């Protein structure tokens, strides 16, 4: 069944554009109480109801934990039976606000769900405990295999209601990985929290450097493919259409065709190509025609890893034109090139914030990579990561990507031995691990909500 949700007209007071101040939430987290979700129906008729309810609850709590705005009261502290209804007294079987106020809850999330055939109906009510008012209530419906999506959608709505800014819980990640223990690297798509992993390439080769189109319906990537009548593999650029399940070859000039990045319109791709000798940055259409060269040396220099700003006005890239690789920014037409990073001996993989005001990048210093952010004009550089391996040696933190709301950074780290995906706040705080296995992940790229 196609996923859908319906908004119930349950508002008990005028909608508040912002209840929680995002900046203040950094200093003091809002205290939430979330009792287990109630099942409405005959348990014997739906033996899978417990697993569905557990998954809904787990996803909601995990999402809101990752948001970093909230702390949670343990269920052992609850004074009321969790089987009480989702509405307050005097409703039959209603709960009492005083029971939640006594244990320090600022907001109470009460939810219930039912199952009709293959459809799950989730109904959630959020209450301000101090004012004893309903903040909002919504009903979400979808097939049982989309229970996670129901929970993600509620969490996005919850954050939008309380902070004025939607969450990122319906976003996806595209990444290169050797999952399955293969000697090859293929391209995978997963939910932002590491669930629902789907392999989208099967080149049985090295597929790297994936990039989302602006609408997250296409993925550009590079794969080292075998050419006909040749023993060598070439780094060719492909685009994969997720909805149609089709792919096509975009750039296959001899040499490098890599580091693709879509422009905001989705009509053009910026990539690194060595078709004229040394690697330079080119702009091409999605069918590989209308090629425009944007950088030209200097002689012997490499210009790689293009990243178009979300507003479409600038392009960041890595270049060793002054000796060591550093990050540069230029106008989208290739003019007015300016070096903006000076972190250690090697700076690479620039990634723009959604507002086009900041860049994140990986910088090599003291024999390891860390993630840094810097303003687009080169000011206010900040180190985001610093981690060690179990043996005490410095770990590498690489390949940053901003969340669509600009509040979070995703990156890879080899602190556990293999390169796993992590997320932190923009200041590096509250770092959390996304993937938990023994495979390696490279260059994750974070989409907007889908």
Enumerate the predicted regions with their spans.
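Residue-level detector of Asp-centered blade-edge/turn motifs that repeat once per structural unit
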Residues: 168-169, 214-215, 264-265, 310-311, ...
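Blade-level signature of beta-propeller repeat domains, shared across WD40, Kelch, NHL, RCC1
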Residues: 416-424, 428-450
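A structural "domain/chain start" motif
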Residues: 17-66, 179
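Amphipathic beta-strand/beta-sheet edge segments enriched in Tyr/Trp
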Residues: 19, 88-157
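Hydrophobic beta-strand positions that form the internal "hydrophobic ladder"
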Residues: 173, 219, 266-269, 312-316, ...
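A flexible loop/linker signature enriched in serine peptidases of the S9 family
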Residues: 166, 178-186, 202-205, 223-237, ...
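Short, solvent-exposed, polar/charged sequence segments at loop or secondary-structure edges
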Residues: 41-58, 65-120
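Short loop/turn segments that connect beta-strands within beta-propeller blades
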Residues: 130, 191-195, 241-245, 285-289, ...
